[in-house]
Swiss-Prot record:
Entry EC number(s): 2.8.1.8
Molecular function as annotated in GO: 4 iron, 4 sulfur cluster binding; lipoate synthase activity; metal ion binding
PANTHER family: LIPOYL SYNTHASE, LIPOYL SYNTHASE, MITOCHONDRIAL
Domain Radical SAM core: 41-254
SMART domains: Elp3
CC per GO annotation: cytoplasm
Protein name: Lipoyl synthase
Length: 286
């Protein structure tokens, strides 16, 4: 019986992978060799990376290629929408590289992709994991106005390490502002652990995220992609993750994922449903 289940899972994985390949689009799930890909795809969740695979920024923890990005594919919105339908997904995460070369940082393209996905798949829950759009409030609002259900933007690390870890065009304060601009939508952010932060700094960052209304928090271990990226300063054990999870819930987060291999999209649908229940119970957005 177990072997039959494994065969069915593998056949389904190959089918979904083939659809992505035929559409000529990218999923973070495959590109980043995500360890959670089987679980996520099996539960109807996938993360699409739009606007190419070359980033205009050079964050020191990230393995994504840096340089001059490709031209936008104006067929991408419909390609992603069709892939969502053919893959039978019910929760979609749309993310991208930074596109500082574009006047609006890619906000219009994000909006077009979300609208296309929603139009073709009206029951699908859509989460966007966005760049900071240079801290531009109107661009953040433009993306949210396209009909997203979850707005995610990662602060990535604690305040003191931000200049070391992230590109100079990013800042801790700017990321908090971006999250504060998102209104009437579930909000999510992530913190990478093991870059040299203290427990007190992690808790301070949690508090800062709650102060700008973040509902869902993801805590995960930083894993060095290659020798070109920053070294891992510490590997957290499960007891430490449990303690951080406990602290996060005490601060008022609706849902917390605290696991070494967690990614922003891990258990995304479950987190969204919990956050929405919290919103309704507390009459928020009314």
């Amino acid at each position: 019986m177990k072997s039959e289940v494994v065969v069915r899972i593998n056949e389904n994985f190959k089918k979904l992978s083939r659809i992505v390949s035929e559409k000529g689009i990218s999923t973070v799930c495959e590109e980043a060799l995500c360890p959670n890909i089987m679980e996520c795809w099996g539960s109807g969740t996938a993360t699409f990376m739009i606007m190419g695979d070359i980033c205009t920024r050079g964050c020191r923890f990230c393995y994504v290629k840096k340089g001059k990005p490709v031209l936008l594919d104006h067929e991408e919105p419909i390609k992603v929408a069709e892939a969502v339908r053919e893959m039978g997904l019910d929760y979609v995460v749309i993310t991208s590289v930074d596109r500082d070369d574009l006047a609006d940082g890619g906000a219009s393209h994000f909006s077009q992709v979300v609208k296309a996905v929603k139009e073709m798949n009206p029951d699908v829950i859509v989460e966007v994991l966005t760049p900071d759009f240079m801290g531009n409030k109107e661009l953040v609002e433009k993306v949210i106005g396209s009909g997203v259900d979850v707005f995610a933007h990662n602060v990535e690390t604690v305040r003191s390490l931000t200049p070391l870890v992230r590109d100079a065009r990013a800042s801790y304060e700017q990321s908090l502002r971006v999250l504060s601009y998102a209104k009437n939508v579930v909000k999510k952010s992530s913190i990478l652990l093991g870059l040299g932060e203290s427990l007190e700094e992690v808790v301070e960052t949690m508090k800062d995220l709650r102060n700008v209304g973040v509902d869902i928090l993801v805590l995960s271990q930083y894993m060095r992609p290659s020798i070109k990226q920053l070294e891992v300063k510490k590997r957290y054990n499960m007891e430490e993750y449990k303690e951080l999870e406990k602290i996060a819930y005490s601060l008022g987060f609706s849902y917390v994922v605290a696991l070494p291999h967690a990614r922003t999209s891990y258990r995304a649908k479950e987190a969204y449903l919990r956050a929405m229940a919290n919103v309704k119970n507390n009459n928020r957005w009314s």
